[in-house]
């Protein structure tokens, strides 16, 4: 499931956006403080970030700049600042789109869909000596194929695709088992153990790190 982070200090608007995006089957995290939003953006995986400019602790432009130094996650700025100078600054700092408040929610949703459509799909991933071929549904280490179940494969692909981004258990559950799945989050831990056991003969089991109280990451 697509992961979206909202960084917006106006709580009524933030809750409204969270409700609308959840209704569209996006998985949403919300932060009301600039520094908290930046920390979340840099420590977790997101497909898209919705970012206000006027925030406590650190402003949106600085957040945008710091994110761009480390990753290419799409960013949509939403703000009451309508001057051309502010729009140019936002885009120059790395935002992918700029929407002036007040805005129509349908327009925002359409812009989100447009940005997500433009994101490249990765068919082959090489990480820590492991090659994952999405089209062939195949995982190899130095030419030797590792036999994985579909769930194990999907789990490994998700972590590898988001290398260096900590994936929360709930995020993993939504991506691999589906948003409407009734399984508990501890099933993620069980399948991580299965996956590590299958990677161990190739000395790759330790590449999946546990982030205590949060989830998992491949470094």
From Swiss-Prot:
Modified residues (4-aspartylphosphate): 52
Name recorded for this polypeptide: Response regulator ArlR
SUPFAM superfamilies hit by this protein: C-terminal effector domain of the bipartite response regulators, CheY-like
Superkingdom of the organism of origin: Bacteria
Any one GO molecular function term: phosphorelay response regulator activity
Function: Member of the two-component regulatory system ArlS/ArlR involved in the regulation of adhesion, autolysis, multidrug resistance and virulence. ArlS/ArlR affects expression of the multidrug resistance transporter NorA and interacts with both Agr (virulence accessory gene regulator) (negatively) and SarA (staphylococcal accessory regulator) (positively) to modulate several virulence factor genes, including ssp (serine protease), spa (surface protein A) and hla (alpha-hemolysin). Could inhibit biofilm development by a mechanism independent of the presence of the poly-N-acetylglucosamine (PNAG).
Keywords: Activator, Cytoplasm, DNA-binding, Phosphoprotein, Repressor, Transcription, Transcription regulation, Two-component regulatory system, Virulence
GO cellular component terms given for this protein: cytosol; protein-DNA complex
Location relative to the cell: Cytoplasm
Gene Ontology biological process terms, A to Z: regulation of DNA-templated transcription
Residues in Response regulatory domain copies: 3-116
